[in-house]
């Protein structure tokens, strides 16, 4: 892989149940319009790294913290940023069967129940098969399933590269990434 670079964003959770969205502007990295001999450009995402920490952005989540959430990065154009309670996700947005889903993670705070698992990444792109975004935005989305006892910061880092796309591939990706 050459010309790989990193993009990142984060979002603060709250303690109440509900959905939240942070928008990552990708418009300077994608150009879904082929002009003459110039081919369209997409953003290939090879890896997604999730980090979940205390609300100070530095400390690990305290062991006594309780609650659960699911988070993911989605190729979605037009979703406004929204805090918990002001966003409402449709059914089947944060799961592996959603074609717009790039990567996702489940988080179970350590004090919720004995033997709670560590954060579980349930979907991610790969170096061999990257997720190619051709829309202007990606959204970091989360759903607090069980009230959290403390607030947290969900951060992501994307390993990505700009790639050129032939017309057939570009058309297929545009169809797939249309809501």
Region annotations inferred by a language model:
Residues 40-51, 129-148, 152:
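Noncatalytic modules at the cell exterior or secretory-pathway interfaces
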Residues 1-27, 107-131:
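Generic detector of solvent-exposed, compositionally biased contiguous segments
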Residues 1-21, 37-42, 52-54, 63, ...:
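C-terminal interaction-tip segments
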Residues 23-89, 155, 159-161:
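Beta-rich globular "head" domains
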Residues 33-38, 121-122, 126-128, 146:
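Short, flexible coil/linker segments at or flanking structured domains
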Residues 77-132:
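Extended, solvent-exposed segments with strong compositional bias
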Residues 10-14, 27, 46, 51-53, ...:
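A structural detector for beta-sheet-dominated domains
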Residues 4, 12-13, 31-41, 86-105:
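Extracellular distal adhesion/interaction modules in secreted or cell-surface proteins
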């Amino acid at each position: 892989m050459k010309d790989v670079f990193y993009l990142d964003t984060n979002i603060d959770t709250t303690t109440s149940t509900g959905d939240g969205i942070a928008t990552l502007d990708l418009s300077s990295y994608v150009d879904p319009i082929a002009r003459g001999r110039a081919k369209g450009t997409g953003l290939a995402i090879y890896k997604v790294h999730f980090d979940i920490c205390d609300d100070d952005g530095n400390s690990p989540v305290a062991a006594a913290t309780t609650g659960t959430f699911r988070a993911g990065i989605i190729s979605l154009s037009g979703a406004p940023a929204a805090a918990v309670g002001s966003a409402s996700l449709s059914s089947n947005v944060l799961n592996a069967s959603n074609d717009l889903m790039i990567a996702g993670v489940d988080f179970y705070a350590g004090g919720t129940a004995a033997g709670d698992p560590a954060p579980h990444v349930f979907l991610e792109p790969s170096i061999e098969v990257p997720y190619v975004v051709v829309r202007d935005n990606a959204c970091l989305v989360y759903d607090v399933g069980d009230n959290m006892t403390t607030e947290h910061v969900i951060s992501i880092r994307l390993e990505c590269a700009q790639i050129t796309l032939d017309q057939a591939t570009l058309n297929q990706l545009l169809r797939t990434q249309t809501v």
